[in-house]
Amino acid sequence: MIDLKQLRENPEAFAECLSRRGDYDLQAILDLDQKQRELETERSQLQARSNQIGKTIGERMKGGANPKDPEIQNLRQEGSTVKATLSDLEPKERDLKAEIGELLLTIPNLPSDDTPVGKDETANVEVSRWGDEYIPKNAKLAHWEIGENLGILNFERSVKVAQSRFATLVGAGAALERALIQFMLDQQVEAGYVEVLPPVLVNSDSLTATGQLPKFAEESFKCAEDDLWLSPTAEVPVTNLYRDEIINADDLPIFHCAYTPCFRREAGSYGRDTRGLIRLHQFNKVELVKLVHPSTSAAEHEALVKNAAAILEALKLPYRVLQLCTGDLGFSAAKCYDLEVWLPSADCYREISSCSNFLDFQARRGNIRFKESGQKGTQFVHTLNGSGLAVGRTMAAVLENYQQPDGSVQVPDVLQPYLKRKVL
């Protein structure tokens, strides 16, 4: 959530920065905020007058005044009027605060100063590439063709069980998925992340804190009777483990990695990636989440990208890093890098990880704070997250980049101890 105080004090600068992301109505928030502050001032003045009336009556009575004295009667009548007015103001002020809060939830994070300005993904900036020497020269088949030929991927039966955009992994396919998950977790634990296995059903407050609600409600699967949602990413449950908490500053940074199945309706992707593992309603992912001191978040963001990239390098999968422009930036992110892996069948790089720095945006929505030892007050932590990695897309990249002329697939060296085999 954006900082209302910052918006109030610097509306022009705030609006200019936010305009790099699109057109947002900040004036409506400012107008409501002005009304709410006027009501707050009026309430404070009335409360002070009510207190003064009570004090004056008490002093008069203590001094022996007659309760029927006209002055006492007038003060009591005024006191009753003031209390009635206060009673009327309270719901108005409460409703205004709620309306302001709802509007604030619709405003995205401010982009960082070094985020490229652009309307869409065509303005993203390539930062680096790795592994050009590993790009295969004669890869011909798409991963779904390889998987179906080997009998390790079954999409047709998945449609029978559920609908389109689901996959069933069979035999070595299921083993490869499991090996990738275990390898990714092992690597990140070694890098200093603490593994957690969180719930995959999350409540509305959790999705609101991380920024999926209210904007992306149509993208998620909901269990309406229970006010629970199927989590679209482990970012949601892991970050919300600390919602409404005050963390000791000495306990920062907090690093977590988590494997979960993820669920997305993909409502806006009709006709895109209709085959294969790239865009499914249910998929597995290993997520990296950081809660850090504001002074270290920029450095931790760069380190997060390296943690995600280390998986691709260990698998010897060619990839590139893009910095997203303002028009392609996620709703909650202030700055984001995408890692894209090479897919020979498409002859291009495809996203496999997004590594975002949210600054205090999510922490403000989720009320996640920290306290310095010996100091008064609290501050909001900075949160970061990135995929480490999307497992299905990693499998697709392995199948395509490691396919052999005879139709088999070589198992990457680092996965052989997990799979106990060298070839699929």
Swiss-Prot record:
Class in the EC hierarchy, top level: ligase
The organism's place on the tree of life at top rank: Bacteria
Residues involved in L-serine binding: 233-235, 287, 387
Predominant cellular place of this UniProt entry's protein: cytoplasm
GO BP, one annotated term: seryl-tRNA aminoacylation
Keyword entries, A-Z: Aminoacyl-tRNA synthetase, ATP-binding, Cytoplasm, Ligase, Nucleotide-binding, Protein biosynthesis
Protein family per UniProt: Belongs to the class-II aminoacyl-tRNA synthetase family. Type-1 seryl-tRNA synthetase subfamily.
Function: Catalyzes the attachment of serine to tRNA(Ser). Is also able to aminoacylate tRNA(Sec) with serine, to form the misacylated tRNA L-seryl-tRNA(Sec), which will be further converted into selenocysteinyl-tRNA(Sec).
Free-text comment on this protein's domains from its UniProt entry: Consists of two distinct domains, a catalytic core and a N-terminal extension that is involved in tRNA binding.
Protein name: Serine--tRNA ligase
